[in-house]
Amino acid sequence: YGVDVFVVDSLLKCGIADDDYSGQKAFVEALCDFKNQFGVTIFLVTHSRKGDNEFQRTGKMDVRGAGAISDLCDTLLTIFRNKKKEAEKSRAQAMHEDMPPDLKNAPDAILYCDKQRNGSWELQATLWWHDGANQYTQNELQEAEIYSQMRVVGQ
């Protein structure tokens, strides 16, 4: 059918128990075999292990589940939402105050490339959230593209 990108969201919904590490490894190996056989790209969404708090970023060592998940993948991306900024923005709006400049100018999220088997690029990209379009852009001044208009039932 010409489909060359697949998104599996998420590993937790694939019927494999949290503690079934060999089952998780077998599933990821099957995805790798499928990718190699058909020349496609597969994004497998996983979750991070719980950390000390939600204000610290996670990396490839924090992928929840079998270590084989991060070992077998070609590229590992993690996204860090700036929850400290989100909390301060909510507080400042409720109190009708300005946000501290360091948080106001900080990105809303950072996309990290923690593993890259197809080259040496393991950097990061800063992202800014646009409520109206429900998407991130590369800087806070960039206009977000609206790809479709959704009608909310009941409004």
Residue ranges: model-predicted function:
Residues 14-25, 52-61:
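Flexible beta-alpha connector loops of hexameric P-loop NTPases
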